[in-house]
Amino acid sequence: MSSPNAILHELLNLDEIMLTNGAEVSRVEETLNRMGHAYGASQMNVFAITSSIVVTMVFPEGEEYTQTRRITTPAGTDFFKLEQANALSRQCCATPLSLTDLKDEINKISKIKPAPYTIYLGSMLGAGGFSVFFGGTILDGAIAVIFAFLLCFLQRHLNSICSNTFILQFFCSLFIGTGICITAFFFPVIHVDKVMIGDIMLLIPGILMTNSIRDILIGDTISGIMRLVESLLWAGALACGFMCAIWFVGGVL
């Protein structure tokens, strides 16, 4: 029989993937509960928040195994990876995998990364569409598309350098906002506000805020408040970045 500690370690690996890719806290706890029982536990005590998971497996013989996982990976949204993690959890609940197979499957899921072109294409289409949707012209949408490409490029290459999400978002919004304002100075025909709105929509933590409200409503108050505060600080960093860009360009040019 595989070591319960080793199994618990892999279960935490799977739940960390779920928590950092858009899963609700209640879903993370439920997954650990179900998988723990599938692997022979008679009782599962699980406590999860956005930054930590604590779980105790109690077996029929009276043995207890407890592990804690500190979540340091910034929260993101990857529904494909989340779907794969959910599918694996259902498979294990129906027919538990061996420790080796479980570890291999989790490693495969953790290595899944979206193709860069899909991120660039989606961001460009989204920024251009939102810019036109909020009243901009086709030219405004085209400018928003260009800066959406630059925004994705910045995020992709600065993410490994800057581990602080708020600072990263601030500098990205500052750079993009400055670029848009300078472009509008030389090409007065474009509408700065419409172009900015299109690119801001790529940065707003909408899913994070939605999940925070959902967590609060279903009783996960601590997790909900943590996510809500994080999303508000994130939005504040974006607002400060674009505000500084407008102030800087307006003062210099």
Residue ranges and their predicted role:
Residues 105-108, 151-162, 210-223:
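C-terminal ends of transmembrane helices
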